[in-house]
Amino acid sequence: MLILTRRVGETLMVGDEVTVTVLGVKGNQVRIGVNAPKEVAVHREEIYQRIQHEKSSDGESA
């Protein structure tokens, strides 16, 4: 895992088209902004896992 340090307002690049910007830090919460092309899905991990679980459940019931 690559670990990077960024301050509020600083950005990191993921590939050529995705940027992740630190918008704010308050206590143990970090607000980030993600700019990505429409064809790149961006989800919180727990939402992504739910989507994957629903996809696999749909496949089993078909």
Swiss-Prot record:
UniProt cross-references to Pfam families, sorted A to Z: CsrA
Record's GO cellular component terms: cytosol
Organism phylogeny: Bacteria, Pseudomonadati, Pseudomonadota, Gammaproteobacteria, Oceanospirillales
Major place of residence: cytoplasm
Protein name (Swiss-Prot/TrEMBL): Translational regulator CsrA
Source domain of life: Bacteria
Gene Ontology BP term (one): regulation of carbohydrate metabolic process
Subcellular localization, as worded in the UniProt entry: Cytoplasm
Gene for this chain: csrA
